[in-house]
C-alpha cells in the first residue's frame, strides 16, 4: 500500500488556489478511479484506489497546511505504512508553473506543510512531488497572497495539463518506485 498525501488548506475558500494544488491532484485521482473521500482515523480524509494490483490511499489533511504532519503520522500509523511508501504532493513557489519535480528526500524548501511533516516524522527521507506555481513575472504583493490566490484562466489551462502528468507520475511511483518515476517525469509540461 502507498499513501499519496495531497497538501492544502481545508476550508472551501481555499478551493482552486495555488496552495491547494496537492488537494487538486488527489481529488482528480479519486475522480478518475471513481472513488470518493471519507473521514480517516485522524485529522484527514481518505479515498482508496487500486491501479495494476497496487492499492493507493489518497490522503487530504483536514488541518491547515502548516500542521500537515499530524495527519501524515496518523495515516501512516493507521495504515501501517513506512516512510518509503508515502508520496507528499505540494505546491512549490520556486518552480515555474507547469513544472513538476519528484524527489526521494530533501529539505522543505520553504514549504511549511513539508516542514511540519519533516518535524513530525523526524526525517526528510520521504518522497515528494512538488508542483510549480511560479509565474514568469511574479505579481507585486506578498508571497502569501499569491499562493492563497486562485489560478487565472490561463494558469488553469497549464495546471490542468500538468495535473495529467502528475497523475501518471503518482501511478508510476506506486508501481515502480520513486527512482523510476523521477527518471520519467522530472520535466516541464510541454
Swiss-Prot record:
Site (Discriminates between blocked and unblocked aminoacyl-tRNA): 9
Residues reported in the UniProt entry to bind tRNA: 14, 64, 66, 112
Keywords: Cytoplasm, Hydrolase, RNA-binding, tRNA-binding
Chief location category: cytoplasm
Enzyme class: hydrolase
UniProt catalytic activity: an N-acyl-L-alpha-aminoacyl-tRNA + H2O = an N-acyl-L-amino acid + a tRNA + H(+)
Entries under InterPro entries matching the protein: Pept_tRNA_hydro (IPR001328), Pept_tRNA_hydro_CS (IPR018171), Pept_tRNA_hydro_sf (IPR036416)
Record's GO cellular component terms: cytoplasm
Quaternary context: Monomer.
Protein name stated in the entry: Peptidyl-tRNA hydrolase
Source organism (scientific name): Chlorobium luteolum (strain DSM 273 / BCRC 81028 / 2530)
Gene: pth
Amino acid at each position: 500500500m502507498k499513501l499519496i498525501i495531497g497538501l492544502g488548506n481545508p476550508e472551501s475558500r481555499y478551493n482552486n488556489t495555488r496552495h491547494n494544488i496537492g488537494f487538486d491532484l488527489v481529488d482528480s485521482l479519486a475522480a478518475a478511479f471513481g472513488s470518493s473521500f471519507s473521514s480517516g482515523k485522524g485529522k484527514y480524509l481518505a479515498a482508496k484506489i487500486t491501479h495494476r494490483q497496487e492499492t493507493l490511499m489518497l490522503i487530504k489533511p483536514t488541518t491547515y497546511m502548516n500542521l500537515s504532519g499530524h495527519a501524515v503520522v496518523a495515516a501512516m500509523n493507521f495504515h501501517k505504512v513506512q516512510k518509503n511508501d508515502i508520496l507528499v504532493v505540494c505546491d512549490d513557489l520556486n518552480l515555474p508553473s507547469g513544472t513538476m519535480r519528484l524527489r526521494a528526500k530533501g529539505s522543505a524548501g520553504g514549504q511549511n506543510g513539508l516542514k511540519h511533516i519533516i518535524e513530525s516524522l523526524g526525517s526528510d527521507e520521504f518522497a515528494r512531488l512538488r508542483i510549480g506555481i511560479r509565474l514568469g513575472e511574479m505579481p507585486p504583493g506578498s508571497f502569501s497572497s499569491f499562493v492563497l490566490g486562485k489560478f487565472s484562466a490561463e494558469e488553469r489551462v497549464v495546471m490542468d495539463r500538468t495535473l495529467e502528468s502528475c497523475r501518471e507520475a503518482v501511478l508510476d511511483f506506486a508501481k515502480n518506485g520513486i527512482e523510476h518515476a523521477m527518471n520519467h517525469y522530472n520535466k516541464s509540461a510541454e
